[in-house]
Swiss-Prot record:
Cofactor binding note of this UniProt entry: Binds multiple chlorophylls and provides some of the ligands for the Ca-4Mn-5O cluster of the oxygen-evolving complex. It may also provide a ligand for a Cl- that is required for oxygen evolution. PSII binds additional chlorophylls, carotenoids and specific lipids.
CC per GO annotation: chloroplast thylakoid membrane; photosystem II
The UniProt record lists the keyword Acetylation: yes
Residue sites binding [CaMn4O5] cluster per the record: E367
Family listed: Belongs to the PsbB/PsbC family. PsbC subfamily.
UniProt protein name: Photosystem II CP43 reaction center protein
A biological process from GO: photosynthetic electron transport in photosystem II
Keyword flag Acetylation: yes
Organism this protein belongs to: Coffea arabica
Source lineage: Eukaryota, Viridiplantae, Streptophyta, Embryophyta, Tracheophyta
Length: 473
């Protein structure tokens, strides 16, 4: 295996373009990749690839810190976060920092601290990235064998996989510790309209936790996205963190079995494709979570979900017309169904009208009015509280339906506010990124499989535009 490092000049993809731009072991002549192929030039230069990855981490953390401080600087405490286009402060608020009852921001200092910590971290990462990209050793195998690797070394690759899994498990436990011991997290279901609380009674029953994975993804089932209490969420992170850490230890201590050695492609590009496939699933899952889930993404910070805004509109007009003397239990709508209330396919009492399609919605402002058979008529007549009316009127006018030119809200709602909800931004961006990463997964998986089969020759470069251009130097 020791001889593999010296094969840096050779790579299994044949690329034919002018190699006039020399970059000391990072040019096309020695790597088979031109300057614009980026990190592909560093496939077999573990030290330089480390620099690229550390610098990339620095850019990511710099964005987090800078954007965090930007949001703090622009934040107006009197307005809800979702009306101000914020996407980072809602995450910090959800973790219980700086907020009090009802999701009201009482202290912005923790947000400032978060921004500064990320900014300082990014400087450290940036320095490390530049050091390893420009000054550090080209390869780590000779001087630092623990950090060195050869892509074909299956045992080393699964050891690296194990280390990554342990780090992910520690990350999951950080949330658990925050919820249990370090001030708790924001619970939108806390009595009286949401509050920060410590999560004490964790759900650790495997039947409940893994039951989510077995649920249908449709309708009122909603797969894991349907989770709606923090005990299950934090308990799920205990399970997830434990599985990741135990799996990490397993992968560090063992070598891949024969079936895995045969079934998988063992090359840098193959690992890239596996990672892109995983990130694609993360993106699609995050998209569904932020669009539908109002427990993990509390509506106090992210605005109502689409179904929530629709049900809020029905509730608001039920309240208004009931005050004006309508009998909401028996009033008939234009289609012959109930105007305010009707029955779902399974017999529960639900809101009538167009919002009937969202009858699965669960929201903290609405659940107190439900009985064993859906909405309770006597509670609707006697028990509606002013905070529920205010909350639903607010959500009705803030549906997450804005377009880029910000013609926002439900088309039928004349009081809708013109804004684009963070739910729209986050769901759309994660769907699009999830899709792109999936395409990248297919692309790199195809190339890696072809290279492993020995017939990858790259693209025909005879008519490459770059060939007719003046060399950069």
């Amino acid at each position: 295996m020791k001889t593999l490092y010296s094969l840096r000049r050779f790579y299994h993809v044949e690329t034919l373009f002018n190699g006039t731009l020399a970059l000391a072991g990072r040019d096309q002549e020695t790597t088979g990749f031109a300057w614009w192929a980026g990190n592909a030039r560093l496939i077999n230069l573990s030290g330089k690839l480390l620099g690229a990855h550390v610098a990339h981490a620095g850019l990511i953390v710099f964005w987090a810190g800078a954007m965090n401080l930007f949001e703090v600087a622009h934040f107006v405490p009197e307005k809800p976060m979702y009306e101000q286009g914020l996407i980072l402060l809602p995450h910090l608020a959800t973790l219980g920092w700086g907020v009090g009852p009802g999701g009201e921001v009482i202290d912005t200092f923790p947000y400032f601290v978060s921004g500064v910590l990320h900014l300082i971290s990014s400087a450290v990462l940036g320095f490390g990235g530049i050091y390893h990209a420009l000054l550090g050793p080209e390869t780590l195998e000779e001087s630092f064998p623990f950090f060195g690797y050869v892509w074909k070394d299956r045992n080393k690759m699964t050891t690296i996989l194990g280390i990554h899994l342990i780090l992910l498990g520690i990350g999951a436990f950080l949330l658990v510790f925050k919820a249990l011991y370090f001030g708790g997290v924001y619970d939108t279901w806390a009595p009286g309209g949401g509050d920060v609380r410590k999560i004490t009674n964790l759900t650790l029953s495997p039947g409940i936790i893994f039951g989510y994975l077995l649920k249908s993804p449709f309708g009122g089932e909603g797969w894991i996205v349907s989770v709606d209490d923090l005990e299950d969420i934090i308990g799920g992170h205990v399970w997830l963190g434990s599985i990741c850490i135990l799996g990490g230890i397993w992968h560090i201590l063992t070598k891949p079995f024969a079936w895995a050695r045969r079934a998988l492609v063992w090359s840098g590009e193959a690992y890239l494709s596996y990672s892109l496939g995983a990130l694609s699933i993360f993106g699609f899952t995050a998209c569904c979570f932020v669009w539908f889930n109002n427990t993990v993404y509390p509506s106090e910070f992210y605005g109502p979900t689409g179904p929530e805004a629709s049900q809020a509109q029905a509730f608001t007009f039920l309240v208004r017309d009931q005050r004006l003397g309508a009998n909401v239990g028996s009033a008939q709508g234009p289609t012959g169904l109930g105007k305010y209330l009707m029955r779902s396919p399974t017999g529960e009492v639900i809101f009538g009208g167009e919002t009937m399609r969202f009858w699965d919605l669960r929201a903290p402002w609405l659940e107190p009015l439900r009985g064993p058979n859906g909405l309770d008529l006597s509670r609707l007549k006697k028990d509606i509280q002013p905070w529920q009316e205010r909350r639903s009127a607010e959500y009705m006018t803030h549906a997450p339906l804005g377009s880029l030119n910000s013609v926002g809200g439900v088309a039928t709602e004349i009081n809708a506010v013109n804004y684009v909800s963070p739910r729209s931004w986050l769901a759309t961006s994660h769907f699009v990124l999830g899709f792109f990463f999936f395409v990248g997964h297919l692309w790199h998986a195809g190339r890696a499989r072809a290279a492993a089969a020995g017939f990858e020759k790259g693209i025909d470069r005879d008519f490459e535009p770059v060939l007719s251009m003046t060399p950069l130097n």
